[in-house]
A protein has these predicted regions:
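Structural alpha/beta core scaffold segments of enzyme domains
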Residues: 1-232
Length: 232
């Protein structure tokens, strides 16, 4: 294999040769902002500053592969009239058919996309670059003039999957004399999954970056939930 560094205008997101996931998690945990608040109630800073009992902790998650039940698969068939049929488990049929039309030059009306429920989805079957075998199946079917069914190996699946980004969340909490929480602060340093697909932070906070943190109904009078956006 002859490896090449991507050019400045490349859409490929390269991984540096010296990349370390442990070092990246440390970098996230030490990032101080700026942070965007999703929830901010009461006076968290004042309560934390005056509390007799305070708890500080940092938690993180690792890169997550979708790990679906079956490896990705696709079947492509060009019909005698030049139309194309593709069998492909997916979560966005219109987007996939538009992408297939762009790749083949066919009018979308001449493309039939069958969407069988295969493999378990978990977000794996959205439209990601190079994460599905259907472009290969289409090219092979066109080349040999016959239907082609393609099933990736587990190695291919894990190599080409889009991983959920890592996150480091710094928690601070203040407790009263009976051990009940008076205040909690959770600041997540991460690039949310939706932000990772877009390649940038949107005008609004990415809810997938704060899953499990925001929108909770605990009766804590002072709370702050925020995100520090760090592009991965």
């Amino acid at each position: 294999v002859d490896w090449q560094e991507p050019t400045a205008d490349s859409k490929v997101r390269p991984m540096p040769a010296d990349f370390s996931s442990d070092a990246w998690l440390k970098r996230l945990a030490e990032d101080k902002g700026p942070a965007k608040d999703d929830e901010n109630e009461g006076d968290v800073a004042a309560v934390l500053a005056s509390a007799k009992t305070r708890i500080d902790a940092t938690y993180h998650n690792q890169y997550l592969n979708h790990g679906q039940l079956e490896p990705p698969s696709a079947l492509a068939r060009f019909n005698p009239d030049g139309s194309l049929e593709v069998w492909l488990p997916n979560q966005a049929p219109d987007m996939f058919r538009a992408d297939i039309a762009k790749r083949t030059g066919l009018d979308p009306s001449r493309i039939t996309l069958h969407s069988p429920l295969l493999g378990g989805f978990f977000g794996r079957h959205f439209l990601y670059d190079a994460a599905s075998p259907y472009p290969q199946a289409i090219e092979l079917s066109k080349a040999v003039g016959r239907p082609v069914k393609l099933i990736w190996s587990r190695e291919e699946e894990f190599l080409r999957d889009v991983l959920r980004p890592v996150a480091a969340v710094n928690f601070r909490a203040a407790l009263d004399n009976d051990g009940w929480p008076l205040a909690i602060e959770a600041i997540s340093a991460t690039e949310g999954p939706t932000e990772a697909l877009a390649g940038k932070q949107g005008e609004k906070l990415d809810p997938t970056a704060l899953e499990g943190l925001s929108g909770k109904s605990y009766a804590i009078p002072n709370k702050r939930i925020a995100q520090i956006y760090v592009k991965g």
